[in-house]
Regions:
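C-terminal segment of N-terminal export signals and the immediately downstream linker at the start
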Residues: 30-58
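N-terminal secretory signal peptides
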Residues: 1-13
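Active-site gating/metal-coordination segments in enzymes
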Residues: 116-119, 125-201, 252, 259, ...
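Divalent metal-coordination and catalytic microenvironments
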Residues: 67, 102, 195, 260, ...
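Alpha-helical scaffold segments that flank or form the walls of functional sites
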Residues: 61-66, 71-124, 147-167
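N-terminal export leaders
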Residues: 10-28
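Short acidic/histidine-rich active-site segments
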Residues: 263-264, 288-312
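Active-site core of metal-dependent hydrolases
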Residues: 197-275, 312-324, 333-337
Length: 357
């Protein structure tokens, strides 16, 4: 692990001096000042959102990574300290490049470890409730009835998580099949019902057929403008569709009010760069820039005593992708691809705040 931190420290020195980071920071400095009157007017309804360290106003979100993971999966007891230290280092790197808010979409996280992380950093951390894909969920989640599942959502959204006063600010559900399985339909339906009651947004894991997820949530009463669908650009989930056909599906979701979250920056093995640019550009050119969200989707987990960062066991280069990557690499690459500073501000500042408001 010492080698890991040495590598990361070297990267942070490089980032501090790099032209890419300078471009990203220059862009972010042009955003609305946090709490400004301009921000108030832009975001319309202002809400207070719970974070790990108290509530914040949506107008104070600033630069937001809307789909991340501080920790992922079960953390072995003897790996807790190194896991927390690793997460803290990555969050502090994000702070240095101008990121203000991280939305964590690990809905069955160990809140105790998250408290340790939050106590050592200054940016806002919004946590989630809900569930991930079935095979990765414990029996304590998969064996819940629909009413019990809804009760869990309500408790973590209104009272606190695992006996703490820390509340979730968003619901996360996941589909890993198309069509959705009976269990997936149940948790999506439960999420839609609690969302209706509490006016809390929903994020989904949507590699396969996001339109089916969108239609099912809306059928069960969800406000389409408070839904976002993650990983829709992952080509292996397109089911044989061309990028043009997939683009048409995303346009239909956007026309219905839904948002898309793109994260495969630097993941050409899942989404060729030209396809990623095509899909984001298609939404923007058709008047749906306000429906585009971007994030890094970084995570790390333990496998047989080894820390796997992103998918570096198969693609070693992905170890270099951290929260900061969105600013140091993805933003400059988007600018080179022809997106404007206003586009980037929409993806990272305006749209996340409006989505939660």
């Amino acid at each position: 692990m010492n080698e890991t931190f040495t590598t990361k420290q070297s990267r942070r020195v490089f980032f501090a001096k790099s032209t890419k980071t300078a471009i990203g920071l220059s862009l972010l400095s042009s955003s609305f000042p946090l709490g400004s009157e301009a921000a108030n007017n832009l975001y319309g309804n202002i809400k207070s959102i719970p974070t790990m360290n108290g509530t914040i106003s949506t107008k104070d979100f600033g630069v937001t990574l809307i789909h991340e993971h501080l920790l992922f999966g079960d953390i072995p007891k003897d790996k807790e300290k190194v896991s927390v230290d690793f997460a803290v280092a990555m969050v502090k790197e994000a702070e240095r490049v101008g990121i203000n808010t991280i939305v964590d979409l690990s809905p069955t996280r160990d809140i105790r470890l998250y408290q340790e992380i939050a106590s050592q950093v200054s940016l806002n951390i919004i946590v989630s409730t809900g569930s991930y894909i079935y095979r990765m969920m414990p029996d304590s989640i998969t064996k819940l009835s629909e009413e019990q599942y809804k009760d869990r959502l309500r408790e973590e959204l209104t009272k606190g998580i695992n006996g703490t006063t820390i509340r979730a600010g968003i619901i996360k559900v996941a589909g890993n099949k198309t069509p959705l399985t009976d269990w997936e339909r149940m948790v999506f339906r439960a999420a839609a019902k609690v969302h209706q009651e509490l006016n809390v947004p929903i994020a989904t894991h949507a590699i396969f057929n996001p339109e089916e997820q969108f239609n099912w949530l809306v059928k069960n009463g969800a406000d389409p403008t408070k839904l976002f669908f993650s990983h829709t650009e992952a080509k292996f989930g397109w089911g044989g569709l061309t990028r043009e056909q997939m683009g048409e599906q995303l346009l239909r979701i956007a026309k219905g009010g839904g948002h898309m979250m793109f994260n495969n920056f630097g993941y050409a093995f899942d989404t060729p760069w030209e396809d990623l640019v095509y899909l984001i550009r298609l939404l923007c050119d058709n008047g749906f820039r306000n429906k585009v969200l971007t994030s890094s989707d970084c995570y790390w987990h333990w496998n047989n005593g080894k820390m796997i960062v992103n998918v570096d066991d198969v693609h070693p280069e992905t170890r270099q992708k951290t929260y900061a990557y969105m600013i140091t690499d993805a933003v400059p690459d988007l600018l080179k691809a022809g997106f404007s500073a206003k586009d980037i501000q929409a993806f990272l500042v305006d749209n996340p705040a409006r989505f939660f408001a």
